[in-house]
Amino acid sequence: MTRFRIALHIVPRRGILDPQGKAVSDALHSLGFPGVQDVRVGRFLTIDTTAENAEAARQSARVMCEKLLANPVTEDFEIASVEVS
């Protein structure tokens, strides 16, 4: 088994109210950043795990997100990277 570090991004789906993102967007505008169009506030996770290969680690991360880490109704997730650690 090989040890992998997986990086995940979980964010609210488009069209889902993101009050935290709205607050950050408003604050950025008040600080002089008028070009900010949209802010989505989510979570960044790193998971250290073991697997036979990178594809098995990626598949495991996908199942983790589908079963626990991301709410499939309100959130989208992205497996940003799977690297040998």
Predicted regions and their residues:
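Long, contiguous binding/interaction regions
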Residues: 1-85
